């Protein structure tokens, strides 16, 4: 297993720089269920921020991208169940993705409120 950082995820999803997109695609397409890529929660939070701020993507488009990462059998997404809930709430509006993740972390830790 190898870890995928935010830059690889952005380049793979956005395809805005041909050379970097090709390098990211080569890395991602070599992943398998037996040798998956790991996506940590911090990379996902940063990915959403970059897609919103730098690329101006909509919540719907970003949510669809995160759904694709969650569904990919050649990826292991850290706390995927929590990410799925956070992205569903994010898609519907209200607080941003990072805030959704923070609220769910609090719930998971037994906090009464966050």
What are these regions (language model features)?
Residues 1-39, 54-61:
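Short, well-structured N-terminal submotif of metal-dependent ribonuclease cores
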Residues 74-114:
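Active-site neighborhoods of divalent-metal-dependent phosphate/nucleic-acid chemistry enzymes
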Residues 5, 46, 99:
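Acidic active-site catalytic centers that drive phospho-/nucleotidyl reactions
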Residues 48, 52-74:
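Active-site-proximal, substrate-binding regions of enzyme catalytic domains
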Residues 46, 66-68, 83-88:
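Short linear capping/connector segments at secondary-structure termini
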Residues 41-44:
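Short acidic alpha-helix initiation/capping motifs at coil-to-helix transition points
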Residues 30-31, 69, 89, 109:
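Hydrophobic helix-cap positions at the C-terminus of alpha-helices
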């Amino acid at each position: 297993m190898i870890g995928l950082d935010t830059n690889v995820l952005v380049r793979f999803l956005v395809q805005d720089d041909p050379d970097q997109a090709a390098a990211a695609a080569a890395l991602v397409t070599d992943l398998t269920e037996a040798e998956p890529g790991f996506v940590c929660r911090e990379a996902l939070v940063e990915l959403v921020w970059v897609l919103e701020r730098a690329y101006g993507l909509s919540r719907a488009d970003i949510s669809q991208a995160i759904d694709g990462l969650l569904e990919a059998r050649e990826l292991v997404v850290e706390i995927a169940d929590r990410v799925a809930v956070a992205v569903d709430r994010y898609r519907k509006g209200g607080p941003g993705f990072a805030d959704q993740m923070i609220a769910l972390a609090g719930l998971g830790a037994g906090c009464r409120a966050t």
